[in-house]
Amino acid sequence: MEQLGTRNPSNGLETIGFSDLSVVRYNFEAAELYEEALRRGEAQLTAHGALCARTGQHTGRSPKDKYVVRDAATGDQIWWDNNSAISPENFERLRQDMLAHAKGMSLYVQDLVGGADQENALPTRVVTEFAWHSLFIRNLLIRPPREALASFLPKLTIIDLPSFKANPERHGCRGETIIACDLTKGLVLIGGTSYAGEMKKSVFTVLNYLLPNKAVMPMHCSANVGPAGDTAIFFGLSGTGKTTLSADPNRTLIGDDEHGWSDKGVFNFEGGCYAKAIRLSEAAEPEIFATTRRFGTVMENVVLDERRAPDFDNGSLTENTRIAYPLDFIPNASETGTAPQPRTIIMLTADAFGVLPPIAKLTPEQAMYHFLSGYTAKVAGTEKGVTEPEATFSTCFGAPFMPRHPSEYGNLLKDLIARNGVTCWLVNTGWTGGAYGTGSRMPIKVTRALLSAALDGSLNSAAFRTDANFGFAVPVSVPGVDDRILDPRSTWSDGQAYDAQARRLVDMFIANFAKFESHVDGSVRDAAPGTKLAAE
């Protein structure tokens, strides 16, 4: 076995059972990994210097193929309603089969860190079959100083072999694709998929399991901080504007996707960004667009034209086109990945029913309710002519990555909000003047104006009304914003149609929250939409 690159000589791949490998390349940097990926035909060089790869059959995550080892340590710690179990015996069989499959291969290893806060950092070794995967994860996680690699010891190891196919009968899984996490041993096995995001989200899942035991809140959110040290957290599901709205030229970006919140403040889990690229434009998102013209950026499933220039409007491979780049490719990104205690929490939703106001102030109890609900709406099946919006509830704004019961995260959040006196807002980036198909998308200028007022504190002194359906406080007037847009009912041509639509959405919230009722106290149950209305 030939071993190349900088590494801890006493901690090679043989220590975790690999044998008879061809070449192992440790901690190669971008130029070397470009050479490898191009030599092996894994990717193409774009006209502007990025590396572009295709993932084949899997162009997104495979949540139904994700498993957690159920053992004595995890048995009563995991939310099994939301996580599929694999037995220790099946996991061990899978591990042995993957090690056997790797014999004769050349592999790539990156020694990286998840978590910018040293006290809560997770040293992570990622072993990949593909060179472009090695560059991807090197971009996404935190890269330790080169001198630290000689003594690096991982607490988590990820083995990603896309050419390995799982056997449902032998491994106790659903199909050939598998993402199996042994949280007790700190080992993740990925096979049968080339989608690189599985590696990133596996680190997130492990941190989401470990950190609550240390009273640290893991969050699927973006974060930024103003010149006065006023940190803001942006929760939101895909497509609600997390990345776009946290990229503010007047504020320092901490990170765009995964963070922890401890008694010291907020810290990024990552050292890079994984941004959606579909319909990316220089005019709308200049900083993110600029990264596509940088050496070192990895593009995933982006279509290239005959000149090897990316066509970001082409979704023929998938709508989920992505770009992965180091955080320092963004001009105003934090160098430390840390920030003081948050002053503001923004919960983003894209309400396609056109019912929610563009902004509302939440009590701590309402914040926990909406955090556990994790609501947004998407337009379902438009290609078949179906234009009815579809409600999506993803608890904690990231259900697929939350191994513990949502109430654990919700209670942590409620305590941190109360302890730090954080102001919470619900921001609707969805539809106004009617539902999807009738109304129009909330103007980004309106959203940015309202966000600016929320972040600088001026919105706190506005006059508020109590929303009749949802019970939260809605500003009546905000400088620079048309008063009418603040009251969604007044933007509809038919007020009674609005009332009926609002009632439908309230009922959806209540039905979804039923599973959490026994896990929260009365004050959170009383924060449910419609409860104030019902009491009157």
Swiss-Prot record:
Entry EC no(s): 4.1.1.49
Pathway: Carbohydrate biosynthesis; gluconeogenesis
Pfam families noted in UniProt: PEPCK_ATP
GO cellular component: cytosol
InterPro entries, alphabetized: PEP_carboxykinase_ATP, PEP_carboxykinase_C, PEP_carboxykinase_N, PEPCK_ATP_CS
Location in the cell: Cytoplasm
PROSITE patterns linked to this entry: PEPCK_ATP
Catalysed reaction, written as an equation: oxaloacetate + ATP = phosphoenolpyruvate + ADP + CO2
Binding residues for Mn(2+): 201, 220, 257
Cofactor: Mn(2+)
UniProt key word Metal-binding: yes
Binding site for ATP: 201, 220, 236-244, 285, 322, 447
Keywords tagged on the record: ATP-binding, Cytoplasm, Decarboxylase, Gluconeogenesis, Lyase, Manganese, Metal-binding, Nucleotide-binding
CDD domains from the UniProt entry: PEPCK_ATP
Gene Ontology molecular function, alphabetical: ATP binding; metal ion binding; phosphoenolpyruvate carboxykinase (ATP) activity
This protein's record includes keyword Zinc: no
Described purpose of this protein according to its UniProt entry: Involved in the gluconeogenesis. Catalyzes the conversion of oxaloacetate (OAA) to phosphoenolpyruvate (PEP) through direct phosphoryl transfer between the nucleoside triphosphate and OAA.
HAMAP family named among the record's database cross-references: PEPCK_ATP (MF_00453)
Family as reported in the entry's similarity comment: Belongs to the phosphoenolpyruvate carboxykinase (ATP) family.
NCBIfam families: pckA, PRK09344.1-2, PRK09344.1-3, PRK09344.1-4
Protein name as annotated: Phosphoenolpyruvate carboxykinase (ATP)
Taxonomic source organism: Sinorhizobium fredii (strain NBRC 101917 / NGR234)
